[in-house]
Every structure is written in C-alpha cells, then in structure tokens.
Amino acid sequence: MSDSPAGALAAELTWTGERFEAGVRLEIGADGRLARLVRPGGGPTAGSDAAPARPLPRRALLPGFVNAHSHAFQRGLRGLGETSAAPGGDFWSWRAEMYGLVGRIDRDRLFDLSLGAFREMRAAGITSVGEFHYLHHEDPDARDFAFDEVVLAAAAEAPIRIVLLVACYAAGGPGRPLEGAQRRFAVDTPDELWRQVDRLGGRLADPSTQSLGAVAHSLRAVPPEAVAGLRSEARRRGVPLHLHVEEQRREIDECVAAYGKRPMELLLELGAGGGDEPLAGTTAVHCTHTRPEELARFVEAGGRICVCPLTEASLGDGIPPLAAALERSPAVAGALCLGTDSNARISMAEEARWLEYGQRLAGEWRGVLRDRAGRVAPTLLAAATSGGAAALGLPTGEIAAGRPADLVALDLDHPALAVATPAALLEAFLFGAGDDAIAATALAGRWSAGRPGRAVAPAERTLLA
C-alpha cells in the first residue's frame, strides 16, 4: 500500500454521480481528500507545474462502498447454523448458535474475526463500515468494555474507515433480565452508554478514519423511554443512532404485549411533534415486517432504512415491503442503505443486486427501485455508497471535491465487464459481476489490492508500491 495519498489519477472511466465519464482527472491532497475533479477540456489545473496524472487504463472508478450495518464477530459463525434436524429452523435457532460463539470468544479471537471481516470488506470494495457493536465485555461481572477497543484496533490494522456504533442492551426482552452469554452485551442505561462513548472518544486509534455513534439494540432490549433518551442525546451530539426494527414477528408480538404498540409505532411516537425531520440521524435496520405506511412515515420524518438482503435471506426473516412503501412515498428509495450484517457472505455488490431482486421476487415484477430515467442500478449504487454515508454521518460515498478519496477500481478487462459499454457498465457490474472484478480500493487515497492472490496490473503497481 502506498505511503502518501497525494497526487493525481486519471482512470479510463470515473463515476461522477449519474454516469461514467472518460478521462476525468482526480487530484488528491496530502490529507487524503479529493482536492478537485478536472474533466477533459475543463481547463488547466491550479499552477502551471501541476504533476501529470498517473493513468489507470482499463480501470473504472466508483465511490468506495459504505457498509452501514455489520456485526464483525459473527464472521466466526460462517458455515455454522446451516444444518437443521427438523424443518422450522429460524432466526431464533440461529441465535442460539450465535450465543455459543459469544460465550467462547476472547480478545484474541475477536480481533482475528474482526480483522478478517474488515479485510474481506476492503477486498469487496467496502471502504467504510458501521459496526453495530453490542459484544462489549470480556468479564461481564466487571463491565470492562474490553472488546470495544479490540474492534477499533482491528479496523485500524485492516485498514477500514469505521463508525463504532456503541450499543445499549438492557434486557433479554421486555421485562426480562439478560442471561448467560447475553450478559456480555450489558449496557443498562443511556448514561452508561454515553460515558463509554466519551471514554472511547479519547482512545481512537486514528481519529481521521474512526468515529462513534450510538445504538439502541432494539425495542425488545431497550425500553421506549431509554430509546427516547438516546435519540435526544444523539441529536444533541450530532452522531447517528441505529436500532434493529421489526426484523422478526416475535419482536413485534412482544412489544405489543408489553407496550401496546409495534416497534415502529413506538419509534414514530418518539419523533412526534419534533419539528421538521424529527427522526433525522436515526436508522432503522431491517424493517422486514414493518407496515408500508409506517415505513413511508418514518422516511418522511427524516429516518433512514438499512436493508441486509443476504442475512435476511440466510435467516429466513422475510423481505421488507419497499415497493408498497414507495407507492406512498417516493422518498423511500433515497433513504435506503445496505449492510452485510452477519457477514456470512461479504459482498456489497451482491447485497445491492438482491435489494432489487428480493423486491422482484416478492412482487413478481421488475424495476421496483428504478429512478426517473427507468434505471435501477444508480439507486442500488446510492444505497451502497451515499445512502450508507448519510446513515453513518460520514463525508464519504461520492467522488467529489472535498470528499475523502475512498475509491473502488473496477477491472474493465474482467470477463463479466469486458463487453459492457460505458452506458451499461454499472448494470454489468451490479447485476453480472462478482467481487473479483474489483482490482483495488483506496482509503483516503491510499491503495490496497483487491482479493488476495489477484494479479496486479502494471498500471496499479505504482499505486500499490
């Protein structure tokens, strides 16, 4: 990986927000940000002695992908939980397997699992991750929060841009205490969470690529009044708040029994009377069984929706009713982001295609997430980039002046892309290619190769030297 990000690049094609353009020069400052973009015929760069751009022939640049929802430690379950002695396996039977891992894990194992997950994300084009982190304590009796800094250390080594979303997890369900392995998750109150956030804020391994946010694990695990307190303080601090919402029907049933309302109803009540976009900065993860009209209201109140298609399929959760929600509010499409969640498979391109494919299967029609031009791929790319950045409060997700130079380089000679025209390249990648079409990624202008063992083209050797 190169030591200095400064310099200029000119790939064969660069995504500039609506299309791929040829010959765009990207000038990257010493701070790892894009100083300017210069299109062919766009005039001279600042200063007559501007260095020539390093050409990247047969490469196309995209913004680095933003993974808005991850549980890195769950990579340790890969290959497990896929055997059922009888029909009827579901999220809850998988969760029992996950709790077994939680009970066994120590700092070294957590570091290795997190590092492996983050490196795999980089190879899949993911340059930023929102780590929804509730596995806090090595010693639950001491409430040591020993695992929080382990995850940050793994992210720094990978390296990957991370927002550590520190979770409040107070109960095993409404009115039920945490038991067994769950005790490693324990953060009882918003005050305890914010004290830990403040402590971690002074210990970030790299403040330029690491930041913090808050989580209410769910309205099963955190009572509504505590969620309200977390939301209020998160808004005051200007940090994101994420929570699982209506992934499982049992979650809905338990909340109705305890509080008389569904989780999304409770969440919408928190935003009532809060002025314009009272739920801005709040991201609801999954929303698998959320009523379409409530999804639309949540988005109109400023909320964002994180869908994790591969994990939701793996666990048999279901498919969120996005098509019906879009009929009620077209703004839903622009509020979407994506996550790899359980990390059973790490591929943002595949998450993006299944965001659309799941809706096609559910509704038996195509083009559910199409934009005004009738294209689906730009909506999917936005969910995988700028949508995730907005959900995490990051300045990433676009190739634009002033943004970090977090980039993905596609190999235009890859068999899945070689016949695609520039006008169809995004569709060819998202619907027809795998992560092996990713040649390299850049984090703040510093490049790393794609998949381990992948051949490095001569054009990239100077970047990766």
Predicted regions and their residues:
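Divalent metal-coordination and catalytic microenvironments
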Residues: 12, 32, 58, 69, ...
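Histidine-centered catalytic micro-motifs
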Residues: 63-75, 240-249
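Metal-coordinating catalytic core of metallo-dependent amide/deamination hydrolases
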Residues: 137-288
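His/Asp/Glu-enriched, well-ordered alpha-helical/loop segment
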Residues: 268-277, 323-416
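A conserved active-site cap/scaffold subdomain adjacent to cofactor or substrate pockets
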Residues: 290-293, 299-329, 334-340
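C-terminal cap of metal-dependent C-N hydrolases
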Residues: 404-453, 460
